[in-house]
C-alpha cells in the first residue's frame, strides 16, 4: 500500500496551555473545522470530544492526552490536503509529565494563552519544557471576547516573562464584547468570519481606518523579522523596502522552525473566530517531520545512530502513552519516526529486550477509531496487542535494533496508603493499580513491608485523587485512603570510617565477612557512589559486589527513621576474610552493618522535599497569602507584578506544609488566586520536626 499523504504534508502538533486558557475548546474547534466533528462540544457541558475520560468531563480539565488525526485544506481551500495529528496535552501542574511526554513526540506546538490573564506560572513551566525539547511553536491568544482581554499586552508578556521573540501575524479588531475579527498582517486584509455558519466561511475586507496606522506599523515589524532570515532577503528589503507575501511566509517559516521567533495569532475559540487561521498557520509555519533534525538513538554496539523520517529507513517508533480501553484492552500510542510497520507484524522492544507482535493498528479520532493496515514514518497511531510495553519504550525492526532517547520521569513526592474496602476489592485493586502504573510512569505502587499496606505515590494531591477516582470508575474498586505521607529522605553531613564485621560460628560451616568503610557526604543530587580501594586482595574480588549490595540495601532502609539515604560516597578500603567461612552473604551483611554503624556516627540528618511554589493573587489578598506561606515555613524568594493589580509570589515551601493548600487558598482569596507547585530539592528538616518524625517511626 502506497503512502496516501506525502510526509511533507504531515504536521504533528500539540496544543499546550495553562489550565483555563481554553485549550480544549480550541481543539474542539479544530476538529469541527477540519470536518470531523459535526457538533461542536463545549467544555462547560462536559461534552468535548478530546476530554474522553469521565473525570475530565466532571472536573472540566483535560487529563489524558488523546491523539487525534485530522485533515485540512486551508480556510480558503488554498492548500493540497494536509494531515494534522494533534496531541491534546493537559495544562494542570500535576500532569506536567503528560506534557513532557507529548512534547517528546511532536514536531511543533500551538501554545494557547488567555487574552485577559496572559502568561501564568503554569504557562512558564510548559514553555520551559517546550524549550527543553526545542519544539517550534505558534501562539494563539484566545478569549479575546473576555473582559480585560488585551492582545498586545499578552505579546509583551511573552517577550518579557518567557524571553521569546514574539512576532504577531495578526491584530485583533476590537476586544472584549466588541471583538469582531482579526487583521491578517501578512496580506494586510481584515478577516470577517461568517457567524451564520459558525465561522466555516469568511470574507476578506479592507482594514478599518481606525486601525490602519497600527496595522502598518506591525506589518513593518513582521517584514523586518522575515528579512532577518538571510542576508539576501535583508539586502532585498533594504533596497526595495518590502518583500513579497511568498518571501515573507517562507522566511517566517524558516525562522519559526529554527526556534528563532514565535508567531502570534489571536481570536476567540468560543465565538468561532480565529481557530481557522491558526490551522492555516500550522500548515504554513510549523515543521513537517522532514523539517526537524532526525531523532538520535543508541544501537546494539552502543554507537549513536540516526533514524531519518523516511519510509525506506528501518522501522523505529516511540511508545509515548499507554491507555486502557474498555473494549480492546491496552492501547499503545506510538510515534513512528522511520520505516513502515504493518499490522500483525513482529517488533522488538529494545528497552525491555523482548520481541512482540502488533495485533491491530488504529488511528484515533477523539473518541472513535479507524483500523489501518500499516503506519509509516511521521504517523501517530495506537497499537493493540502489545503486552510488555511501558511509556518511553522504543519499538523497532528486530534486525536493526535501536534505543531512542529515553524520557526522564520525575520522582514522586507524595504517598498515600490505600486499602480495599472489602475482600472482593482486594484482588481487583492489585490489577487496577498495575494497569494504572503502566500508563503513567510518574505514578508508583509499592507494599510497605512493615505495615503490609499498599502505598501509591505521585506528583501531587490532584494526581493521586484522580488515580483513586479512576480505580473506582474504571475498575469498580472501592478503597479507603490514608493521610498523605511525605517522601522524606536521609543523608549524612560528616565523614567517618566504620568497621562491619559479621562472624557466625555455630557448628558446621560458619560465616565470616569483615570490611572497613569510609563514608563521606556526596554532592547534592550526585546520588550513591561506591569506590573499591582494596589492595592486596584483603577482601577477595568476588565478594566486593556483595559488599556494595549490602550497603545499598541498608541505604534503602535508612538509619534514622527508615527513609532511603541520599548522596553518600562509600569507599571500601580494608577488611579480611576466612578461606572456608567467607561467602557473598557474609560480606553483604558486613557491608550493611558497616554502613549502618558509620552512618549513625556521621551526623545523619532527615531531609524533607521542598517545593517551588508560585501564587498568582489579586493585590488586596497579598498580605494574607504571604502570611499564610510564612506560617507554612515558606521562604519568600520574590514577587513580580502581573497585569491589572495581580501579584505573583515566588516561594519555597516544605511539601508537608502544603497539604490542603488549594482549599485554603481558595477560601482566603474567594477563589481568585491560583498556584502552581513543583518539586525543587531536598533540604534538612528542622530539628523539632525531624525529632517528631523519628519518634513516630520508631
UniProtKB/Swiss-Prot annotation:
Residue sites binding GTP per the record: 17-24, 88-92, 142-145
Q: Where is this chain's protein located in or outside the cell?
A: Cytoplasm
Keywords tagged on the record: Cytoplasm, Elongation factor, GTP-binding, Nucleotide-binding, Protein biosynthesis
Q: Which InterPro entries match?
A: EFG_II (IPR041095), EFG_III (IPR009022), EFG_III/V (IPR035647), EFG_IV (IPR047872), EFG_V (IPR035649), EFG_V-like (IPR000640), EFTu-like_2 (IPR004161), G_TR_CS (IPR031157)
What's any one GO cellular component for it? cytoplasm
Q: Write one Gene Ontology MF term.
A: GTPase activity
Q: Which GO terms describe its biological process?
A: ribosome disassembly
Q: List the Pfam families hit by this protein, alphabetically.
A: EFG_C, EFG_III, EFG_IV, GTP_EFTU, GTP_EFTU_D2
**All residue ranges annotated as the tr-type G domain in the record:** 8-290
- Which PANTHER family does UniProt cross-reference here? RIBOSOME-RELEASING FACTOR 2, MITOCHONDRIAL, TRANSLATION ELONGATION FACTOR G-RELATED
Q: What does this protein do?
A: Catalyzes the GTP-dependent ribosomal translocation step during translation elongation. During this step, the ribosome changes from the pre-translocational (PRE) to the post-translocational (POST) state as the newly formed A-site-bound peptidyl-tRNA and P-site-bound deacylated tRNA move to the P and E sites, respectively. Catalyzes the coordinated movement of the two tRNA molecules, the mRNA and conformational changes in the ribosome.
Q: Which family does it belong to?
A: Belongs to the TRAFAC class translation factor GTPase superfamily. Classic translation factor GTPase family. EF-G/EF-2 subfamily.
What name has this protein been given in UniProt?
A: Elongation factor G 1
Give the classification, highest ranks. Bacteria, Pseudomonadati, Pseudomonadota, Gammaproteobacteria, Alteromonadales
Tell me the gene name. Answer: fusA1
Amino acid at each position: 500500500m502506497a503512502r496516501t499523504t506525502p510526509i511533507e504534508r504531515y504536521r504533528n502538533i500539540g496544543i499546550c496551555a495553562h489550565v483555563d486558557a481554553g485549550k480544549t475548546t480550541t481543539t474542539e474547534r479544530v476538529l469541527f473545522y477540519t470536518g470531523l466533528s459535526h457538533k461542536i462540544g463545549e467544555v462547560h457541558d462536559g461534552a468535548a470530544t478530546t476530554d474522553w475520560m469521565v473525570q475530565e468531563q466532571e472536573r472540566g480539565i483535560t487529563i489524558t492526552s488523546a491523539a487525534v488525526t485530522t485533515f485540512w485544506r486551508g480556510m480558503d481551500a488554498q492548500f493540497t490536503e494536509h494531515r494534522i495529528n494533534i496531541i491534546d496535552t493537559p495544562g494542570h501542574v500535576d500532569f506536567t509529565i503528560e506534557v513532557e511526554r507529548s512534547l517528546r513526540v511532536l514536531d511543533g506546538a500551538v501554545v494557547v494563552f488567555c487574552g485577559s490573564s496572559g502568561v501564568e506560572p503554569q504557562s512558564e513551566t510548559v514553555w520551559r519544557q517546550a524549550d527543553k525539547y526545542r519544539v517550534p511553536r505558534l501562539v494563539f491568544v484566545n478569549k479575546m471576547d473576555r473582559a480585560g482581554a488585551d492582545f498586545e499586552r499578552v505579546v509583551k508578556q511573552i517577550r518579557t516573562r518567557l524571553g521569546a521573540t514574539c512576532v504577531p501575524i495578526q491584530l485583533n479588531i476590537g476586544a472584549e464584547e466588541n471583538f469582531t475579527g482579526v487583521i491578517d498582517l501578512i496580506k494586510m486584509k481584515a478577516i470577517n468570519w461568517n457567524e451564520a455558519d459558525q465561522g466555516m466561511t469568511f470574507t476578506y475586507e479592507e482594514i478599518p481606518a481606525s486601525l490602519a496606522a497600527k496595522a502598518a506599523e506591525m506589518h513593518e515589524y513582521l517584514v523586518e523579522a522575515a528579512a532577518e532570515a538571510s542576508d539576501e532577503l535583508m539586502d532585498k528589503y533594504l533596497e526595495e523596502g518590502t518583500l513579497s507575501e511568498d518571501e515573507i511566509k517562507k522566511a517566517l517559516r524558516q525562522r519559526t522552525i529554527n526556534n528563532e521567533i514565535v508567531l502570534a495569532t489571536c481570536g476567540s475559540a468560543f465565538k468561532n473566530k480565529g481557530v481557522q487561521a491558526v490551522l492555516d498557520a500550522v500548515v504554513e509555519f510549523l515543521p513537517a517531520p522532514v523539517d526537524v533534525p532526525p531523532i538520535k538513538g543508541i544501537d546494539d554496539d552502543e554507537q549513536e545512530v540516526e533514524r531519518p523520517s523516511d519510509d525506506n529507513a528501518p522501522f523505529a517508533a516511540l511508545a509515548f502513552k499507554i491507555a486502557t480501553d474498555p473494549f480492546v484492552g491496552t492501547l499503545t500510542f506510538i510515534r513512528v519516526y522511520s520505516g513502515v510497520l504493518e499490522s500483525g507484524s513482529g517488533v522488538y522492544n529494545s528497552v525491555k529486550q523482548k520481541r512482540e507482535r502488533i495485533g491491530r493498528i488504529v488511528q484515533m479520532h477523539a473518541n472513535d477509531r479507524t483500523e489501518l493496515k500499516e503506519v509509516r514514518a511521521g504517523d501517530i497511531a495506537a497499537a493493540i496487542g502489545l503486552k510488555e510495553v511501558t511509556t518511553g519504550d522504543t519499538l523497532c525492526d528486530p534486525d536493526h535494533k535501536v534505543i531512542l532517547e529515553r524520557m526522564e520521569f520525575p520522582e514522586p513526592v507524595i504517598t498515600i496508603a490505600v486499602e480495599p474496602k472489602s475482600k472482593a476489592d482486594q484482588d481487583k485493586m492489585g490489577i487496577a493499580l498495575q494497569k494504572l502504573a503502566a500508563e503513567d510512569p510518574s505514578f508508583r505502587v509499592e507494599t510497605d513491608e512493615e505495615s503490609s499496606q499498599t502505598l501509591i505515590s505521585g506528583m501531587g494531591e490532584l494526581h493521586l485523587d484522580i488515580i483513586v477516582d479512576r480505580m473506582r470508575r474504571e475498575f469498580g474498586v472501592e478503597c479507603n485512603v490514608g493521610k498523605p505521607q511525605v517522601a522524606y529522605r536521609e543523608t549524612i553531613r560528616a565523614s567517618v570510617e566504620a568497621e562491619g564485621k559479621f562472624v557466625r560460628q555455630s557448628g558446621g560451616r560458619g560465616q565470616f565477612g569483615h570490611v572497613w568503610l569510609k563514608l563521606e557526604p556526596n554532592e547534592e543530587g550526585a546520588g550513591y557512589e561506591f569506590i573499591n580501594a582494596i589492595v592486596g586482595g584483603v577482601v577477595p574480588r568476588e565478594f566486593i559486589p556483595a559488599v556494595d549490595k549490602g550497603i545499598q540495601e541498608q541505604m534503602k532502609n535508612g538509619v534514622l527513621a527508615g527513609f532511603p539515604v541520599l548522596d553518600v560516597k562509600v569507599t571500601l578500603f580494608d577488611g579480611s576474610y576466612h578461606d572456608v567461612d567467607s561467602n557473598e552473604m557474609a560480606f553483604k551483611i558486613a557491608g550493611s552493618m558497616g554502613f549502618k554503624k558509620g552512618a549513625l556516627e556521621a551526623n545523619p540528618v532527615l531531609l524533607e522535599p521542598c517545593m517551588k511554589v508560585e501564587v498568582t493573587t489579586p493585590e488586596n489578598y497579598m498580605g494574607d497569602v504571604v502570611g499564610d506561606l510564612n506560617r507554612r515555613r515558606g521562604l519568600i524568594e520574590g514577587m513580580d507584578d502581573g497585569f491589572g493589580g495581580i501579584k505573583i509570589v515566588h516561594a519555597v515551601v516544605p511539601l508537608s506544609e502544603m497539604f490542603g493548600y488549594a482549599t485554603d487558598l481558595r477560601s482566603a482569596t474567594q477563589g481568585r488566586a491560583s498556584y502552581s507547585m513543583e518539586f525543587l530539592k531536598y533540604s534538612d528538616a528542622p530539628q523539632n520536626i525531624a525529632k517528631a518524625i523519628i519518634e513516630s517511626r520508631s
